[in-house]
């Protein structure tokens, strides 16, 4: 998460923690025994916070191979204590895209016209002023960050072939696929 506004990150972080914990609990229930359950709980995704571009880039480089996705504001300082840059989020996402064209990115802003910047770097956009921002965020996390059901699609038509909720579903359907 890249955000310099304490009021916003104070509200978004609990939402993210709750979502990740809920997903971890669901994942842990598939464990064969208590030890595996605890191991799966400890292996849940970590959420890191950056307040400027430099910090965000350092964190991204540190965790790039294990990054599920990046959520960023559009406007924040490039350096600690520096002036806010109107397009810092776009600059960050452009740099990330050069390194990894597939990592999910979410650009959020209270300015709806910034949605165009999100499109330019193939990112999703969430309006901070939306009354259902929490729901939009959860939906994007579930659909693009690797949470939720595993959906198998026909590569030609993109039609859903199968939806697997857990390993049991995979076992039950493996020969049908």
Residue locations for each model-derived region?
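CheY-like receiver
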Residues: 1-14, 59-62, 136, 138-140, 145-177
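Conserved acidic segment of CheY-like receiver
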Residues: 1-7, 12-36, 49
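Short, flexible/disordered intra-domain loops and linkers
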Residues: 11-14, 78-88
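Well-ordered, non-membrane alpha-helical segments in soluble/globular domains
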Residues: 22, 27, 85-94
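Acidic, metal-coordinating helix/loop segments flanking the phosphotransfer/catalytic sites
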Residues: 27-69, 77
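Short acidic-hydrophobic, aromatic-tinged amphipathic segments that line or gate anion-handling sites
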Residues: 48-51, 125-129
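A short, hydrophobic beta-strand element within the central beta-sheet of small alpha/beta folds
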Residues: 68-72, 90-127
